[in-house]
Amino acid sequence: MPEVSLYNYTMSICSMKTRLAMEEFGVDYDDKQVDIGFALENFEPDYVRLNEKAVVPTLVVGDRVVTNSYNIVLEAAKLGKVGIPADPVENKAALDWFQKGDQVNFQVITYGHKGVPRGDELLIARRERAKEYAEKYPELRSIYQAAHDRIVEHGNCAYDADTVAQAEVDLQKRLDELDAHLADKPFIAGSNYSIADIMWTVLLARIEMLNMTAWISERPNLLAYYQRMKARRSFETARVMPNWKGGI
């Protein structure tokens, strides 16, 4: 297997998904931390040349670069040759629920619930850094300008009450559906752990981090499932965080 490096940040929800995939699917990797807090390391030129969106995570496999946690989890399953069931029914369930989790707007929910310490200040700092670097590095201006515009749009959405409320409604519908789905299954796809469990273990941990645990505990099948996932060794080794740790 070629050398594998994962650029990530401990408290990033998307980074947690990829670390959990690496641990569960048995992929050895070099853990490269990129501080996306006030250090703003994700805006440094060397990093944006790897990931033009200036976000984490980023996976490098040999000379290939894979961005977006969705793609990285799939790549980890491919490298580990596990996580995507061969059985057609379980395969469909794994992919369907993996996609359903990815569609939930947890970024808006997290910032809307003030889940990131000094989150308001951080968004301003990111916006200003992108603007500054667009002038400082003219060869990368279009990348930094696009990053600036995404940060502005994210801030507008994250602090719009209607947008946050709709994201919460969408999430609760998914949780109801998943609770019913888990009535007779140890894992989301069925009898085998899959990419769907990667996705939802991390999303449920984020719900806990946001002090919204009632959304889990009031759904008995979901609660039992989450407890099983938390008991897996990978939950700790992948640093899936149900509570905020450290600064920003």
Swiss-Prot record:
Signal peptide: none annotated. GO terms for molecular function: glutathione transferase activity; trichloro-p-hydroquinone reductive dehalogenase activity. GO terms for biological process: pentachlorophenol catabolic process. Keywords: Aromatic hydrocarbons catabolism, Oxidoreductase. Its EC number is 1.21.4.5. Optimum pH is 6-7. Induction: Constitutively expressed. Residues 2-84 form the GST N-terminal domain. It catalyses: 2,6-dichlorohydroquinone + glutathione disulfide + chloride + H(+) = 2,3,6-trichlorohydroquinone + 2 glutathione; 2,3,6-trichlorohydroquinone + glutathione disulfide + chloride = 2,3,5,6-tetrachlorohydroquinone + 2 glutathione. The keyword Oxidoreductase applies. Pathway: Xenobiotic degradation; pentachlorophenol degradation. It is an enzyme of class 1 (oxidoreductase). Residues 133-248 form the GST C-terminal domain. Belongs to the GST superfamily. Homodimer. Sequential reduction of tetrachloro-p-hydroquinone to monochlorophenol, using glutathione as the reducing agent. This is Tetrachloro-P-hydroquinone reductive dehalogenase.
